[in-house]
Regions:
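Single conserved hydrophobic/aromatic residue that forms the stacking wall/gate
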Residues: 1-12
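Active-site helical microenvironments for divalent-metal-assisted chemistry
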Residues: 13-206
Length: 206
């Protein structure tokens, strides 16, 4: 009887592990990497706010997974790492960590503002608007118009930088998408985002 119970428990755990329930170590490692980068140039208060954003994003995206099967949290932390690598300010990194919480989770801008301040909520809102613009203007003939509208829509250039960091990490994991979506995303990046990155001086990332 005990053997049967133990066997059943192991089967259940194996099933849960296949669903990524227990796969937290990689996100923890990425969090340490983000902190190592940020502590080189940011004050302790900013780093604490970044960790607060990591914890908030972890709860907001709980149960969400990437196409790769990895916890969704891996994506916003990688966006944060890219931004920290560019030595962006703390609010920009926090907004990068939270850039999907309003669009993909039941989180309001009001809540983001209450917890992280108006500056961060404005950046998150800007990224959300840019995403909506992206979806409307993906045709080849509208690339130049997209660049103009993106800069006009994003009152703060940091919005564009966050969106580019988001796109950059998505490209690094593009192999997990169906072939047609890989082609679509690559085309969008080359025609819409790469020229935009050059316009704002992000040559190394473009």
């Amino acid at each position: 009887m005990w053997i049967g119970l133990v066997g059943s428990e192991m089967c259940i755990r194996d099933r849960l592990e296949s669903l990524n329930i227990f796969k937290k170590p990689k996100t923890s490692k990425l969090s340490y990497e983000l902190d190592d980068l940020s502590k080189k140039y940011l004050a302790t208060s900013a780093r604490k706010n970044i960790q607060k954003a990591v914890d908030f994003a972890d709860k907001a995206h709980d149960g969400q997974f990437r196409k790769s099967g990895e916890p969704f949290l891996i994506h916003p932390i990688n966006v944060g790492i890219i931004l920290a690598g560019l030595k962006m300010d703390g609010d920009t990194i926090v907004a990068g960590l939270l850039h999907d919480v309003v669009e993909d989770c039941e989180i309001s801008l009001k809540e983001v503002k209450k917890l992280f301040g108006k500056n961060v909520s404005n950046l998150v809102n800007g990224v959300t608007k840019l995403l909506q613009l992206d979806e409307k203007l993906i045709d080849q003939g509208q690339a130049e118009y997209f660049q103009k509208m993106a800069l006009a829509t994003a009152e703060d250039v940091r919005v564009v930088i966050i969106k580019w960091a988001d796109r950059l990490h998505n490209l690094k994991t593009i192999e997990h998408l169906p072939r047609d979506k890989q082609i679509k995303k690559s085309k969008e990046t080359l025609e819409l985002y790469a020229p935009l990155a050059h316009q704002i001086g992000m040559h190394k990332m473009a």
